[in-house]
């Protein structure tokens, strides 16, 4: 299959969280075009079954392939945990997740080999971060804590609200007591709560945001497979945004997260795929 090097990269998430990954791709791979899909009609993914998440991911990948993308980033930890292996086997296109990149960094930066992971119930319950970390260093102890209210709070725009601070304090208390020195933000929504989480955990805990490392991993993949954009045919605005619901609300969030104003977000019927 001949690949168009100047085709866009597809990025998808359950909602707005994957924009933190898209932002890092824009910063680190500025020549690459991006097609972003946020599944805002079905957010959050964290409380849904493996079979449901795989089904959602298949639909989204079919849509992104219709947009002629050359590679896909699953910018959602829950979908990476539950669906990545299945869709990599099923589709003839390079597909990256966000879990391994964060785990590798956490293993490098921890000093006392006690690593915390916060994420949705699905991500933490899957044990995937512990599995990856133990492969890198069997001596690492992994303490997981589901934080199911974080995604709805972020999607509501309450990133600095006193309610969010109170919820975060309750969730993170357990991790504070476990003497971790490294904390993986195991959901792409969570970097939007970084200041609140960092304030609660204190300077002694390193926060790992897998978004940056995922962008670098994508860059390596594109280089290895000779798929880097040549920069030819670059439009004035090389990014397209699609959602399954609430297009205007999504656009408002995107404008606060990305370094430019998103002029158009298109709602599509993802169930058709």
Spans of features found by a protein language model:
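Non-catalytic structural scaffold of enzyme domains
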Residues: 1-273
């Amino acid at each position: 299959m001949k690949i168009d090097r100047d085709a866009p990269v597809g990025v998808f998430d359950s909602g707005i969280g994957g924009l933190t990954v898209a932002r890092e791709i824009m910063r680190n791979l500025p020549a690459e075009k991006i097609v972003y899909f946020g599944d805002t009609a079905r957010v959050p993914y964290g409380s849904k079954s493996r079979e449901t998440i795989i089904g959602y991911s298949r639909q989204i990948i079919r849509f992104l392939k219709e947009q002629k993308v050359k590679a896909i980033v699953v910018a959602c930890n829950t979908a990476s945990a539950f669906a990545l292996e299945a869709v990599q086997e099923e589709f003839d296109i390079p597909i990256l997740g966000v879990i391994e990149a964060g785990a590798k960094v956490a293993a490098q930066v921890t000093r006392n080999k006690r690593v915390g992971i916060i994420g949705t119930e699905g991500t933490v319950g899957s044990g995937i971060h512990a599995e990856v970390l133990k492969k890198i260093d069997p001596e690492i102890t992994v303490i997981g804590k589901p934080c199911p209210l974080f995604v709805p709070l972020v999607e509501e725009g309450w990133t600095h609200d006193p309610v969010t601070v109170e919820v975060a304090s309750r969730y993170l208390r357990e991790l504070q007591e476990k003497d971790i020195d490294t904390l993986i933000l195991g959901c792409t929504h969570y970097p939007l709560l970084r200041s609140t989480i960092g304030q609660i955990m204190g300077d002694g805990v390193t926060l790992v945001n897998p978004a940056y490392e995922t962008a670098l991993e994508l860059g390596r993949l594109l280089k290895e497979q000779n798929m880097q954009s040549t920069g030819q045919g670059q439009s004035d605005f090389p990014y397209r945004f699609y959602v399954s619901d609430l297009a205007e609300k999504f656009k408002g969030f995107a404008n606060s997260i990305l370094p430019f104003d998103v002029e158009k977000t298109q709602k599509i019927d993802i169930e058709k795929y």
